Amino acid sequence: MKTNIINTWHSFVNIPNVVVPAIEKEIRRMENGACSSFSDNDNGSLSEESENEDSLFRSNSYRRRGPSQREHYLPGTMALFNVNNSSNKDQDPKEKKKKKKEKKSKADDKKESKKDPEKKKKKEKEKEKKKEEKPKEKKEEEKKEVVVIDPSGNMYYNWLFCITLPVMYNWTMIIARACFDELQSDYLEYWLIFDYVSDVVYLADMFVRTRTGYLEQGLLVKDELKLIEKYKANLQFKLDVLSVIPTDLLYFKFGWNYPEIRLNRLLRISRMFEFFQRTETRTNYPNIFRISNLVMYIVIIIHWNACVYYSISKAIGFGNDTWVYPDVNDPEFGRLARKYVYSLYWSTLTLTTIGETPPPVLDSEYVFVVVDFLIGVLIFATIVGNIGSMISNMNAARAEFQSRVDAIKQYMNFRNVSKDMEKRVIKWFDYLWTNKKTVDEREVLRYLPDKLRAEIAINVHLDTLKKVRIFADCEAGLLVELVLKLQPQVYSPGDYICKKGDIGREMYIIKEGKLAVVADDGITQFVVLSDGSYFGEISILNIKGSKAGNRRTANIKSIGYSDLFCLSKDDLMEALTEYPDAKTMLEEKGRQILMKDGLLDINIANLGSDPKDLEEKVTRMEGSVDLLQTRFARILAEYESMQQKLKQRLTKVEKFLKPLIETEFSALEEPGGESEPTESLQG
């Protein structure tokens, strides 16, 4: 082991040079009382003494030295710690081991590099490969993550539209090609292309189903194995497998004129129904979509019935009687278009129960016509019922609105209201209906949870409320509370929103329309307020020292039809009870506004609390006390009823147990009664 000589300047004169060997060994020697390798002699004597002490330490034949001898080596230990420039106790044994390993690895690398430079190059290459493999592994892990389709998203809905097209194609064309031979033979190449494109879409749909997530405990499942297992456990998986069985191979046996071998493709109809259901919930015109959907179903049924009629006519023989399709050798009835249109016409007349068709002749024809009439009756009933309900739903809002108008008309006639006032009322109702303002927002939104209702109100009204000066810097929670309390109001031309001297119980925000600040004569206009303007915010705060009090200071009149948002004083104060800091801030803002306008009496504002405020607080306290009293009375009544029920139960238990106890006591009083129970127990 190499030792280094370090010149140190120490307070001890006898230590000009210090030899630093292995530090841990020296510490152990000093703890055991052995001589340290540090001494006052030169290097030769130091090494000799250390060798002697090593031999003594190994043979365990030395004795521990006393404290006087240990003091002799104290300067050496001090120098040792000064050389390290840190406390050995602060170093963790783990860190020491790590440093030793690093030193060993570096020493080994140096030795190997000197011996074999090729090995060094190999190791460097291996390290580079590992570095390159790490990003590759990360990329592979990212690739393994399955892309899951959200069933409520647009991507899934668009895919449903894509799969619906081949389903509708198969449901309409397979039966037509099977019944009309010319349709299959003349356009065979096109049909094969469409068929196999639809088969590819069917296969892709099976893959999409394995990547379509589902909700489990409110969370979208993205595990690939779970998605596949759920799809396989579903009945639709079996139907999907049956729908893609390659029955087209039977073409090689029967020929190309048998497209009915592809009837298994019709089993994928559930995807079409799913697409229609989702479209009905997404569209803004659900009633129109329902009617068009119903018409489509009826057309498909008529189409299928026409194809079956033509195939029955072909089986019986064209032109054999008056009921079947005429002879195809006739040029007029030999064209493909005439064949299909004639069959479709016959099917429509039969299924709509019009019945202006030639009567059947054969028994099979009679059976087919009877079945058609039964189907037609069901179709007719379905049409009448569905369309009737749709029309009633479409007109429900109008009927309800009209009933309100009729009720008000009857009331005005009963009270002999003037014709001018009646015209104004009717015009106001017409404006509401034409501008679609008859919807009661609270009634529509009452089925939604509070969170969703609040979010809708925030999206609709929050920007409008922030325009008001006093609410500009309020807390978000207070603004949400106030947004939920805004009430829409509509004023017709010439209506006064407020007049000078009226008590201010509401503030108003103009959503749409124009209002005019007019003189007492109602004609002279001072200012015109437009969209986004507001007024009455100071009066509902009821600020102490206001020269106007809580009364209106101007006449405000609607020029045309105006839509306003109204916030009442009671609603504001109810919201501010939960936000006392916001209340003080609003009052301070109101005072500043009044001071700018010169409408604040500072002397009154600096006085103590207003007795009116105290009265309001007292009334509120009385109201809360009344509520507590009613709750206490209700709880007391419940307690009394429960107590009465318990008494009744106890009396029933007493009645039941009393004869049993009497019989037991009578048995004990009789001679030998004590032995009878024991005997009975033993028996």
Curated annotation (Swiss-Prot):
This is Cyclic nucleotide-gated channel alpha-1. Rod cells in the retina. 3',5'-cyclic GMP binds at residues 536, 539, 552-553. It is found in: Cell membrane. The C-terminal coiled-coil domain mediates homotrimerization of CNGA1 subunit. Residues 105-144 have a biased composition (Basic and acidic residues). One of its GO terms (cellular component) is rod photoreceptor outer segment. It comes from Rattus norvegicus (Rat). It comes from the Eukaryota. Its main location: membrane. GO terms for molecular function: calcium channel activity; cAMP binding; cGMP binding; intracellularly cAMP-activated cation channel activity; intracellularly cGMP-activated cation channel activity; intracellularly cyclic nucleotide-activated monoatomic cation channel activity; protein-containing complex binding; sodium channel activity.
